[in-house]
Amino acid sequence: MTKEEALKTYYGYDVFRGGQEAVIDALLSGRDALAIMPTGAGKSVCYQIPALLLSGITLVVSPLVSLMRDQVTQLVQMGIPAAFLNSSLTFRQYLLALDRARAGRYKIIYVAPERLETEGFQAFVREADISLVAVDEAHCISQWGQDFRPSYLNIPAFVESLPHRPPVGAFTATATPDVKADIHRLLDLQDPLELTTGFDRENLYFEVQQPADKRAALLELVNIQDILERVNV
């Protein structure tokens, strides 16, 4: 299967969006990558398609339990074998997931950064064929970032401990120059492809209104907010 066939088969698209193909090509060639792309630009495709084409397992380091669950649910619905390993699993569920991973049942495994240091997971990766490590929300490694997670600092040592160093892809929608430099340095990226796409979101805009009845406008805004909260937007 080619990357284009994977895009069409699993995602239903005929062409890649801006920046995706370059990152995919870099990771497939064994090169590290640092991609700064806005939310909704398709960052996940940049590591999910290589995961489908590479022979082994792709590990996706993610800081958010809810995001892992949503991503895995979506992948399974698409027919892509995936799982997550985080604190929401019971110990029995965790062991079962590792057993299935050892049996080659998954192509993509989402994992919390804290899990990388556990003895059971370390034993698993020593036996497994890890083809790619994708670091989602990579800005969490930087103390300059608003979501600093100390556990992200252990990712480079984890990667180096693998029997064979796989390519590492770092992905974020939030990166000032200082944060970008930290991601590169602290993740120990090796000659990475660095790509930053535009941040223009056509569906977002600013509007200044001057309502004649400010009280009515405020009540309308409160009602809209209440509706959004009810539907979890």
PLM features: residue spans?
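Conserved pre-motif I regulatory segment
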Residues: M1-P38
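Pre-Walker A (Motif I) flank of P-loop NTPase domains
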Residues: S29-A35, G56-I57, R105-K107, P166-P167, ...
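Walker A/P-loop
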Residues: G30-I49, V60-S62, F171
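Conserved helix/coil segment N-terminal to the catalytic DExD/H
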Residues: A41, L89-L132, C140-Q146
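Conserved strand-helix element at the start of the C-terminal RecA-like helicase core
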Residues: T58-M68, Q225-V233
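Conserved helix-turn-beta segment of the N-terminal RecA-like "Helicase ATP-binding" lobe
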Residues: R69-R92, L96-A103, D182-L187
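Post-DEXD/H (motif II) to motif III coupling segment of the RecA-like Helicase ATP-binding lobe
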Residues: R126-E127, S131-T196, R215
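Conserved interdomain hinge at the start of the Helicase C-terminal
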Residues: F206-V233
